[in-house]
Amino acid sequence: MSSSYWSETSSSSCGTQLPEVLQCQPQHYHCYHQSSQAQQPPEKNVVYERVRTYSGPMNKVVQALDPFNSREVLSPLKTTSSYQNLVWSDHSQELHSPTLKISTCAPSTLHITQNTEQELHSPTVKVTTYPQTTIRKYVVQNPEQEPLSQFLRGSQFFPGNNVIYEKTIRKVEKLNTDQGCHPQAQCHHHIVQQPQVIRSAHWQQPDSSQQIQAITGNDPISTHIGNELCHSGSSQIHEQVIIQDDGPEKLDPRYFGELLADLSRKNTDLYHCLLEHLQRIGGSKQDFESTDESEDIKSLIPKGLSEFTKQQIRYILQMRGMSDKSLRLVLSTFSNIREELGHLQNDLTSLENDKMRLEKDLSFKETQLKEYEELLASVRANNHQQQQGLQDSSSKCQALEENNLSLRHTLSDMEYRLKELEYCKRNLEQENQNLRMQVSETCTGPMLQAKMDEIGNHYTEMVKNLRMEEDREICRLRSQLNQYHKDVSKREGSCSDFQFKLHELTSLLEEKDSLIKRQSEELSKLRQEIYSSHNQPSTGGRTTITTKKYRTQYPILGLLYDDYEYIPPGSETQTIVIEKTEDKYTCP
């Protein structure tokens, strides 16, 4: 529960008259309202009250600020707005006021008139129109719920679900306090605009009934409400209360001045706070302070007013100027911030674009790096294989070079030996030729011829053996050379294979040539012998013994002759002599 509003005014003429009390018993409860001021001389027949109304979501109660039925003169401390005195009364309590008294009465009708000049002629109370009035609202809803405020806990709440709107006045003129109340109650209000019924609520008790109507006006200056309260089963006493409102309600000028001063200070503090925050974010004071000070506050204050009113107007003008400065400051700050936010948004967009481009470049470079790493790994593997193959080929080349050098040395030695053999052969042939010449000069006969043939055959056989050895050596060297070429040609491909085959064929061809040469030499020798034998004079018949030397490791030769004996292959040779008898016949 919170305080809804202050309902408190001051009168130009206030006194220390004992406060009278307005007693209400609509639902067996009493609310007391008092108001007192101790600054002006007392005025006769006037009732003063000071109240505070608390409103909440469930109920609304009234708090009296002055002690009930106080006879003492209130001090200025107690008349201030901070002084409070909450008074509650039991429903059984009954207060008697010589001025105003509202007791239980039968339900009656509430009369509202538009004429403010009308006066109710009552012997008890005369109500005149005063310019200062106020509105008091008493709202009670759901009284079963316990109040939330610590000031109201433990107090007696009002039963029922009634909403009561009551309007009282500040000044009531007391005519005659000794007379009784008339059983009719009327309330006259001055309503500027047409009244409008807002809300009405009904509440019934087992032994009584009561109807309460809430009426208010649309005028923002004053609100006019009248209530008829009262009902009692045992008492039929009626009292008449006439409430008339004619002027607008006014607040305390001191409270209003303090409020304006507080608002001016808060507005100035807000402006300085905004300026400080603006300087923190990089703005300058000269850019946002208004330089137009031509408007003079004093010239705007009308003359003929009190100093208090002038001070209030000055506060209002200062607050207006400070509000304009704060507004310009906020607008310029927001424009600068909007511009900076635009720049930051553009920078952020460019940075995001750069980020996306860099991410794309990074992904592309990562793929390139992976491909480069794979390529580098394959190149390293190939390089390792090539280095290994190069080492193997270099070792093979080194071995082949060594073999080539050794073969060259051997070939040079063989050539040198071959030259020596050829030189020996020429010497032997020369010697043979000389011997033949000597033999031909000395003697001619079959024995000599046989001797010469034997020597010639011996030398021929020696030459053949030498040639065969030389051929074998040459073949061996050629085979080694071919093997070397084979090893070299394995790396060169099919061309080397053809070259190797060509070398083999050339070697075979050379062997065949050498064999043909030997056979041709033997054939030429045989022809020469036959020719020489034909040139000699014949005597009857001559027997020629041809001696040939065969190797006996061929058993197939036994098929040709009956007397052939097989000799196992070995290093020994056997000479077969064939005698041939020639008979020469002469023609007659």
Curated annotation (Swiss-Prot):
Name this polypeptide is given: Protein POF1B
Q: Where in the cell is it found?
A: Cell junction, Tight junction
Record keywords, A-Z: Actin-binding, Cell junction, Coiled coil, Tight junction
Q: What does the function comment of this entry state?
A: Plays a key role in the organization of epithelial monolayers by regulating the actin cytoskeleton. May be involved in ovary development.
Q: Does the keyword Iron apply?
A: no
Q: Mention one GO biological process in which this protein takes part, according to its record.
A: epithelial cell morphogenesis
The cellular component terms of Gene Ontology attached to this UniProt record, alphabetical and capped at eight, are: actin filament; adherens junction; bicellular tight junction
